[in-house]
């Protein structure tokens, strides 16, 4: 089946990487530029709608979009033959392309690790999905927010590195 070979698979993996990335970074920006700043303005009796319904659903898509972006990105790097050179930041090839795409790859990997190993575990505590003391709940909310802000700041140079890798010079 020609559809399952060569350029079609590469196209499909790239498409999944880009769509997953748009969803991931879009939700990241939603959390940081819409939800977090709006929470103090929401009356206390309405906050459970966010913390019990909207946030858990958004976090579901957020964390799985992060994982799928990384998986499809690594598959694409392997398909196109630059996985090793990209992860080595171009030191193995002296290529500006590999350096830039590698910087983007590493920032994306750091961001995904932040999502799965810091943001999500702390959000479960902050949203009451895991039973913790009120002090631990507040600390978890702050930790999740700080790492989410870190990811927001990394998202701009990460995106720039990914895009500019295709136009070195």
Where on the chain are the PLM-derived regions?
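Polytopic transmembrane helical bundles with strong interfacial aromatic enrichment
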Residues: 1-169
């Amino acid at each position: 089946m020609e559809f399952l070979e060569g350029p079609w698979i590469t196209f499909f993996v790239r498409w999944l990487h880009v769509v997953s990335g748009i969803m991931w970074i879009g939700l990241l920006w939603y959390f940081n530029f819409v939800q977090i700043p709006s929470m103090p303005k929401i009356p206390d009796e309405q906050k459970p709608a966010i913390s019990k319904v909207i946030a858990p659903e958004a976090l579901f898509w957020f964390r799985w979009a992060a994982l799928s972006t990384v998986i499809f990105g690594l598959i694409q790097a392997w398909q196109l033959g630059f996985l090793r050179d990209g992860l080595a930041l171009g030191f193995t090839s002296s290529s500006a392309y590999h350096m830039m795409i590698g910087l983007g790859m590493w920032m994306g990997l750091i961001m995904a690790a932040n999502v799965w190993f810091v943001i999500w575990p702390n959000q479960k505590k902050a949203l009451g999905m895991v039973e913790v003391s009120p002090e631990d709940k507040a600390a978890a909310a702050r930790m999740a927010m700080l790492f989410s802000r870190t990811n927001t700041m990394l998202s701009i140079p990460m995106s720039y590195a990914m895009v500019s890798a295709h136009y070195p010079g």
